[in-house]
Amino acid sequence: MNVYAIRAIYHFEMARARRTLMQSLIAPVISTALYFVVFGAAIGGRIPHVEGVSYGAFIVPGLVMLSLLTQSISNASFGIYFPKFTGTIYELLSAPVSYYEIVIAYVGAAATKSVILGLVILATAAFIVPLRIEHPVWMVLFLVLTSVTFSLFGFIIGIWADGFEKLQIIPLLIVTPLTFLGGSFYSINMLPPVWQTVSLFNPVVYLVSGFRWSFYGLADVDVWVSLGMTCAFLAGSMAVVAWIFRSGYRLKT
């Protein structure tokens, strides 16, 4: 394994994040904090507790997941698309660096930025709503797995996109609606039975449910099922990335 190449790409991506700190960290934290203030502090005070947890605290895991998913995709997709746009990716592909080393570097940097963002949002939420973490190891596990999985997904989008506007199509039109409908602001047990069943086809339900369980011991889906679905999506994303590099899809043309 070419550790020097991985480290060089990783440091380059992290340096880019530092140069765009307002966009990559401060803006998502402020926008999520507004959710905490409006839904948690203002409206949440008028809503009964959800399964023994205040509404403001209940929505924290879902809002963290919302930021985590969108930023993981955005970080990774732009990170790999920009070299495609400028043509420098061909220098990278012709260098003595294997495909999996490229993926480790880009996805590792995107996941690192997302984990940092998630932790900062949690720290911010602790000042606004009462927050407790019953299973910190599981919390970190879901945080890291989700960041890596959706960074891989973002990497795929960055390879697929042939224009800057396409980088935002899937996050805006698919990921964000799925997150809002995935139990971020409510428990799916509040829904009629038919819609509970329909919700189980939403992959974000498993992410939010498992992440919320790590905080309060409350889950819409068994935590092991949530973990299994997360790992399955991770494996699927890895398989697609492997196929992309084997076939040269959108890389050799």
What are these regions (language model features)?
Residues 1-136, 141-253:
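Hydrophobic transmembrane alpha-helices and immediately adjacent juxtamembrane helices
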